[in-house]
């Protein structure tokens, strides 16, 4: 999403989206 956790690709992020 766009925070600092890690989505599918790893280049994206979670908590912020």
UniProtKB/Swiss-Prot annotation:
Coiled-coil residue spans: none
InterPro entries in the record: Pyrokinin_CS
Chief location: secreted
List of residues that carry Leucine amide: 17
Gene Ontology molecular-function annotations: neuropeptide hormone activity
Protein localization: Secreted
GO cellular component: extracellular region
Protein name according to UniProt: Pyrokinin-5
């Amino acid at each position: 999403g766009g925070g600092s956790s890690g989505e599918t690709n790893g280049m994206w992020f979670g908590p912020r989206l």
